[in-house]
Swiss-Prot record:
Compartment list: Secreted; Target cell membrane
Propeptide: 22-33, 69-74
Role this protein plays: Possesses antimicrobial activity against both Gram-negative and Gram-positive bacteria, as well as against the fungus C.tropicalis. Also possesses a relatively high hemolytic activity. May act by disrupting the integrity of the bacterial cell membrane.
Protein's GO biological process: defense response to bacterium; defense response to fungus; killing of cells of another organism
Lipid metabolism recorded as keyword: no
Name the UniProt record assigns to this protein: Antimicrobial peptide HsAp4
Modified residues (Arginine amide): 65
Signal sequence coordinates: 1-21
Homology family: Belongs to the non-disulfide-bridged peptide (NDBP) superfamily. Medium-length antimicrobial peptide (group 3) family.
Record-level GO cellular component terms: extracellular region; membrane; other organism cell membrane
Tissue distribution of the protein: Expressed by the venom gland.
Swiss-Prot/TrEMBL keywords: Amidation, Antibiotic, Antimicrobial, Cleavage on pair of basic residues, Cytolysis, Fungicide, Membrane, Secreted, Signal, Target cell membrane, Target membrane
Length: 74
């Protein structure tokens, strides 16, 4: 892999971890508290990471809200 690809991969990984950390500090609703009572910390962390990755994918697929992605217009 080229240095550029490695750098991009590292930066995206750091962004995902940072966003997951920010998400974990948000106020939890009663539903989330009930849901978390039966799950381990590792499961919660992986769930947060998956949620962040899904949001990033949605953001890359349609970068401008209210407009469809270019691939969907054709």
């Amino acid at each position: 892999m080229s240095r550029r690809r490695i750098l991009i991969l590292v930066l995206v990984t750091m962004l995902v971890k940072t966003m997951a950390g920010m998400e974990s500090k948000w106020v939890e609703t009663t539903y989330e508290i009930k849901k978390r009572s039966g799950t381990s910390e590792k499961e919660r962390e992986s769930g947060r990471l998956l949620g962040v990755v899904k949001r990033l994918i949605v953001g890359f697929r349609s970068p401008f809200r209210g407009r469809r992605a270019i691939s969907e217009q054709t």
